[in-house]
Amino acid sequence: IAIAIGGGYAWVTGKKVAMTDMPQMIAMYNGMGGGAAATIAAVELLKAQGEVASGAPTGDRLNALGLEALNTHPETIAQAMGTDVAILAIIGAIIGTIAFSGSIIAWAKLDGRLNSNKLLPQQQQVNLVLAVLLVIVAVSVFNTDSLMPIVVFFLLALVLGVFITVPVGGADMPVVVSMLNSYSGWAAAGIGFSLNNSMLIIAGSLVGSS
C-alpha cells in the first residue's frame, strides 16, 4: 500500500513539473531518500534504547535469541544492537540526516526561496566544530543507555546538513545535489547492512557509487 501511494503521488506530481524545475524535484527526492534512511536508523536506535531501558531484548532480537534472552541484559545501545550493527546504523543516520536537511536547502536555493550564502561569520570553522561535536555525540550514542544523546545526535546532523549546503552558490548546486544523492545511497546501504537487507544494500550501493 505504501509503495502504491508513494509511487502514485510521485507519478502525478512528476508529470506536472516543468523541465526547468527538474533540479528542484531531484533535490527534494534526494532529501526524501536520505530522510527515509535516517528515520529507519532512528527507529532502530530507539528500539535498542528501549531494550536497554527495559533490561532485556524485545521484538526481533527476542525472537532470534530465544531462551538466551533470559540471560541477556544489554547496558548500552552497542550491546543491544551488536557493535557492527550499531556502527553502521549510526553512520547511516549521520549520512541520511545530512542528506535530508542539505537537500531541503538545495531545493530552496534552486527554487529561489533562499538566497543567503552564509548564516554565520566564520561559517567553515563553525561547520568543523559541528562535525567534531557530531562525532563525539555519535560515540556517546554508541555507549549510552539514555534517549537524550540520540536526540542531540540527530539535531546536530540536521544542523550540519544545513550549514554545509547554505554557503554553496547556485552555479555549484548541481554538484551538491549529485553529492547529496550519493549520500542518500550510502545511507541506505549502511542501514541495509544493519537490517541485513540485501535489497537496501544493493540499491544503496548503486546510488552511492553513481
Language-model region placement:
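Loop-to-transmembrane alpha-helix initiation sites
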Residues: I1, A80, D84-I94, V151-F153, ...
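Transmembrane alpha-helix boundary signature
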Residues: I1, V12-D21, A38-R61, E75, ...
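Alpha-helical transmembrane segments in multi-pass membrane proteins
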Residues: A2-G6, A10, G14, G33-A36, ...
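Generic transmembrane alpha-helix signature in multi-pass membrane proteins
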Residues: V12-K16, I26-A27, G35-L46, T165, ...
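Cytoplasmic-side transmembrane-helix entry/capping segments in multi-pass membrane proteins
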Residues: D21-G33, K118-V129, P174-Y183
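Hydrophobic alpha-helical hairpins/lids featuring a short glycine-rich hinge
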Residues: I26-G55, G66-G96, F100
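Helical transmembrane-bundle signal
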Residues: G34-E44, G96-G102, A106-K109, A131-V141, ...
